[in-house]
Amino acid sequence: MGDVDRDGRAERFWLLGSAEDDYRGPVRLDNGPSVPGNPLANALVRLPLADGHRGRIGDVNGDGYGDLVTGIAEDPSMAGSPDAAHLGGEIQVLYGGPDGITADQRPTVIHQDSPGVPGAAERGDLFGASLSLGDADGDGIADVLVGVPGEAIGKLEWAGAAVLLRGAEGGLSGAGSVAYNRSTAGIPGAAEKDDAFGSTVHLADLTKDARAEALVGVPAENSDGCVWAARGAASGPVTAGSVNHCGKSFGITGRGDHPKAHFGDALPGVHRAV
């Protein structure tokens, strides 16, 4: 939820997941009850040019209006359908304004073939599998942290990565973006096959210094899973001094009642209602 038209009330968007006639995921704007006194009779507006399986709202161009950012990670190689994301996955941006977000609005699409975005679009990268919005550099404009858990690091398949896209007055783009993985200098540990770094991501100002810290889930790390945490700074998340918080430290492992659940599996950024 977020205020995309600055009327003082938050709008809700529903991301309905893959459908038979729309694998990329239909998006609906929920304007609230259309029948007074009946909270179930909501007026849903279809946004036919928008897609997404997960999303977040934040002001990524600094104009005071909330913007909707969605992710579609599954490309045709994974979906088995040509009606899927750009090779390797993509995110979309719908900018808010005085009229909010409207049905005739065409989103801005960003992927790993976009100018300035680190890496290259490859089958199964899952760019956009998770995403989070927050001001990572303290400039007053929201940035977007994008999970890329299927990214290969060298020959290490599914080692995973995360990409920070910087918000700016001109809108979100690849300019100044930064990629992180477990081979990046300053990040503890080492990239390993099937770690799935970036399966979950979150930006939050944990230190109350107006710069969001970055949290990245690595749920397949060893038997328990980890979350990597880096403090925010004017340059964005700082890898020097960053730490891993792993399940074993909290008495959590991938064994027991839920052997397929791991620490780092759950962070905000994967919900279908925004």
Describe the function of each predicted region.
Residues M1-V4, D51-G62, G128-G138, G198-K208, ...:
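Beta-propeller blade termini
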Residues R6-L15, G62-G71, G138-V148, K208-G217:
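Acidic/hydrophobic-patterned starts of short beta strands in beta-sheet-rich repeat architectures
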Residues L15-G17, G71-A73, E122-S130, G134, ...:
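Extracellular/lumenal glycan-associated surfaces
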Residues G17-D22, E74-P82, G150-K155, A220-S223:
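Short glycine/acidic-enriched loop and turn motifs that connect beta-strands
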Residues R24-A50, Y95-L126, R166-A196, A229-V274:
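Blade-edge motifs of beta-propeller repeat domains
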Residues D30, T70, I91-L94, I110, ...:
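Hydrophobic strand positions within the blades of repeat-based beta-sheet folds
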